[in-house]
Amino acid sequence: MYKRATYRIRSNEPLTETVYRMVVEGDTQYLTAPGQFVNIELPGRFLRRPISVCDYDGHTITLIYKVIGEGTAQMPGMAAGGEHDMLTGLG
């Protein structure tokens, strides 16, 4: 089962030049194990971006992503406090 909801970005920090850690706040009830993924809606993009879940707790989801193409190149600019539509509990 999956859930569509709006999630608030708590942090979005570089780990390397192309790898980032993003922590989002919101409902995590449909996540059951690390390795599942979320689909993040990005402005101006038809397709959502699938990103693997690194960790989660009752209110936050930690995502690790690599900037590879035009879609993920937008993600480092997603600032703390911003809100984005996501599908969770996938995979």
Question: What do these predicted ranges mean?
Answer:
Residues 2-82:
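Ferredoxin-reductase
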Residues 41, 87-88:
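Residue-level recognition of conserved beta-strand edge/terminus positions
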